[in-house]
């Protein structure tokens, strides 16, 4: 599955100082963000047969580690996202990711009280 990954080990280590209520709030917001990325990516996906759009999924099975994956297993997805020398790029995943992670960062700041 194609995916975007952020490595934020220092941030995750700093979460140990917070109680479970705060951690649960962060996990909830992360899930919401992941589902919003999926939703927005599907909206922006070019549709011919609908296969690519239908293949975009979200995996939150590692939410306890603050990890979510949004992606597709369709082999031609990177060609659509990034283009080829004969075909212009038609990004769908990266714009959805960037839009929603900005919102997530603000929500995380609010939950952590600006810390």
Predicted regions and their residues:
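Short, Lys/Arg-rich flexible segments
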Residues: 1-115
